[in-house]
Swiss-Prot record:
The keyword Transmembrane helix does not apply. Belongs to the pyruvate kinase family. The lineage of its organism: Eukaryota, Viridiplantae, Streptophyta, Embryophyta, Tracheophyta. It comes from Oryza sativa subsp. japonica (Rice). Homotetramer. The record marks 256 as: Transition state stabilizer. ATP binds at residues 60-63. The keyword Translocase does not apply. This is Pyruvate kinase 2, cytosolic. It catalyses: pyruvate + ATP = phosphoenolpyruvate + ADP + H(+). Its EC number is 2.7.1.40. Key regulatory enzyme of the glycolytic pathway that catalyzes the final step of glycolysis, converting ADP and phosphoenolpyruvate (PEP) to ATP and pyruvate by essentially irreversible transphosphorylation.
Amino acid sequence: MHSTNLLLEEPIRMASILEPSKPSFFPAMTKIVGTLGPKSRSVDTISSCLKAGMSVARFDFSWGDAEYHQETLENLKVAIKSTKKLCAVMLDTVGPELQVVNKSEASISLEENGTVILTPDQGQEASSQVLPINFAGLAKAVKPGDTIFVGQYLFTGSETTSVWLEVSQIKGDDVVCVIKNTATLAGSLFTLHCSQIHIDLPTLSDEDKEVIRKWGAPNKIDFLSLSYTRHVEDVRQAREFLSKLGDLSQTQIFAKIENVEGLNNFDEILQEADGIILSRGNLGIDLPPEKVFLFQKSALHKCNMAGKPAVVTRVVDSMTDNLRPTRAEATDVANAVLDGSDAILLGAETLRGLYPVETISIVGKICAEAEKVFNQDLYFKRTVKHVGEPMTHLESIASSAVRAAIKVKASVIICFTSSGRAARLIAKYRPTMPVLSVVIPRLKTNQLRWSFTGAFEARQSLIVRGLFPMLADPRHPAESTNATNESVLKVALDHGKVSGVIKSHDRVVVCQKVGDSSVVKIIELDD
């Protein structure tokens, strides 16, 4: 296993830890995905979330209908315009998730050593004696002695709000369980997780397909979070489905690894998916506690070497109800960054948490501090060694741009790209400075109308560590041919100056295509 990329060669002066951090336009290189819900769906709150550092908005269809989420999305669009901050949209599928709907929303008290029946009869009311579930095949999937976890949707892991059950007997379609700990289940939706048991339900359900078709396609979602990805075929089938929905052929698929099946098929899934979400909540139930860190470090390393974004979930659960994270959570966020995470995904913390904006802000600050002690030199050498020789042309250009930027202490790398691939390859080498990804739009036609590409590519870089996109004006050349022409490069430099990442006399590394050649050049700015 590869060690954490922590810079320890230079002794840190302990008193320097107490010095205030310098303000920055970019809160952190590590991106933050926020789940929008009851506590975070107003225009004002979303605007504050964007300013605090949220770059991807997640819409979770495990609860709420399309109309509810559409209202939230419209508020997001207003917030984007008012803050002038780009934000991508992620749709999270339900998949083969086992659920208990608590129609009355009354709290359900369960006592240790008592019994409760899990039944597929959804006509029954949820109570301390019976929990109706959405899966008729549970009695055939489990056996006496198996463990089942039940918690509030997006559970925080608190033993007082979640319960462990042990299967004691099967009665027809019903499963009788012994309660292992006293708990009170609160809320309208509970989820069940059967430890290391195969659930015979499709990864992309008919309900998921309907939501994608009727909500995802009209809204041109940037990412599809494929819940409970178990096999590489799950990703292929989802991609085939998206390819038939017009613009969604460009939507990136992030495979959500939530159980042992996904873990066992991780390498094949990684090759096919556009990115990976490590769903540590459910996976933490399937794995022994002492093995969770090993999975995280190994999975993140594999994602890094493949150059695919990796997202870590469940980091500051306690901030759902508290203004500050625990010491363990603060350390966990930092370690996720040092392990190689591209983004941190916040679930309950922003969906129903009391402090969504503060949570995003604090997580961003922790990420920024961790990035300062990331051993980029060690990481760079390891990545180059893994890529091997001969490198592809694009890989060689990307690694050279990063090495040059570090050697000359450049303040930023500017990369001109159409597909976004060149910028993502630069980000793969984890430069210590921001990468300004200037997306050059391309004109395309279907014989009936013209349209520009580029918006998808720009937004999809919002989940990649260190990439900050801007859409270029297609009327301007990539570089001016004379002093009077306004070039895209000048616009990019001006954007960097306004953002505060570029100052007078700074050095900037530019990566662009000139004719058929790819060029890396270093420019030094005048006053």
